[in-house]
């Protein structure tokens, strides 16, 4: 059996999105400061260099070899 909040919460979210948000959003967008919506000034955060990362995510210094031989 499904719990009551699992049914009620999605229905309330759908009602808010469909009927209430079109009326509330224009009012809030005038009051809310524009700075809170914009991205931060640090543009280096979006640049990622993956050349030195191995398959496990750790940086590698040189070529690695995978040995198929079992070591005892």
UniProtKB/Swiss-Prot annotation:
Region listing for Necessary for its localzation to the endoplasmic reticulum and lipid droplets, in residue ranges: 1-33
PANTHER family attached to this UniProt entry: UPF0729 PROTEIN C18ORF32 (PTHR13456:SF0)
GO cellular component, one term: lipid droplet
Protein name: UPF0729 protein C18orf32 homolog
Family of the protein in this entry: Belongs to the UPF0729 family.
Assembly description: Interacts with DERL1 and AMFR.
Source species taxonomy: Eukaryota, Metazoa, Chordata, Craniata, Vertebrata
Keywords: Endoplasmic reticulum, Lipid droplet
Compartments where found: Endoplasmic reticulum; Lipid droplet
Region called Disordered, residue ranges: 36-72
Post-translational modification: Undergoes ER-associated degradation (ERAD).
Function according to Swiss-Prot or TrEMBL: May activate the NF-kappa-B signaling pathway.
